[in-house]
Amino acid sequence: MNNFLQQINSYIKEAFNAGKYLYNGLSVTFDHLRRRPVTVQYPYEKLIPSERYRGRIHYEFDKCIACEVCVRVCPINLPVVDWVMNKETKKKELRNYSIDFGVCIFCGNCVEYCPTNCLSMTEEYELATFDRHNLNFDNVALGRLPTNVTTDPSVKPLRELAYLPKGVMDPHEIPASDTRVGKLPEEVYDWMRPEPNENKDKVSNQIN
C-alpha cells in the first residue's frame, strides 16, 4: 500500500514538473510572438545604416599628399601608397593608392588621422564578391561615389534597427502593433521645429 501511494505521489510530482516546464517554454514562445521581427527580406528590403556607420572607404585622389599617415596608424599597415619624388619640385607625386577590403577591419583610423580629409567612411556595406582579389580597390574604385539605400527605388529602406524610439535599446522591445518604429534625423528636426504661428505668438508676447 505504501509503495502504491509513493508511486502515485511521484507520478503527481513528475506531472506537475512537466506542466511547469511546458508552461515556461510556451511563455517564452508566446512572448516572442508579440515582438516585432528583426529579420529583413534582403535584397528587397535593406536597413538604413546609422550616421556613424563604418562602411566602404571613399578616397579623393586630388586631396591626397602621399604623407602615408594612414599607413602608419593602420593596425595592419594595409593602405598601399605608390609615389615617386619629383626632383624638380622636391615633392611627392602620387601614382596609385589601394586598399584591400578583404583584409581591412574598418577601424576608421585612416579616416580619423588623415590631414587632408581625403578619406571618409561611407554607408556602403555590400562588398560581397566571388573572387577575393576583387576586394582590392585601387584609387579609381575607391573614388566611386557610394550607393545610398534611401535613393534606390528597387528596395524598401528600413530604419528599425538604426533609429529606434527614445528609450528603446532593443528592437525586440517594440510591440508588433506599433507602426512608427523610429524617425530619421530630418524627421526629428521637422517634428521639433515650431509652426510659423507659434513664432508669431512668441514674438507678440515678448513685445507686450
From Swiss-Prot:
Gene Ontology MF, one: quinone binding
Gene Ontology biological process terms in this record: photosynthesis, light reaction
Residue sites binding [4Fe-4S] cluster 1 per the record: C64, C67, C70, C114
Enzyme class: translocase
Family as reported in the entry's similarity comment: Belongs to the complex I 23 kDa subunit family.
Function of the molecule: NDH-1 shuttles electrons from an unknown electron donor, via FMN and iron-sulfur (Fe-S) centers, to quinones in the respiratory and/or the photosynthetic chain. The immediate electron acceptor for the enzyme in this species is believed to be plastoquinone. Couples the redox reaction to proton translocation, and thus conserves the redox energy in a proton gradient.
Protein's name in the database: NAD(P)H-quinone oxidoreductase subunit I
Taxonomic lineage of the native organism: Bacteria, Bacillati, Cyanobacteriota, Cyanophyceae, Synechococcales
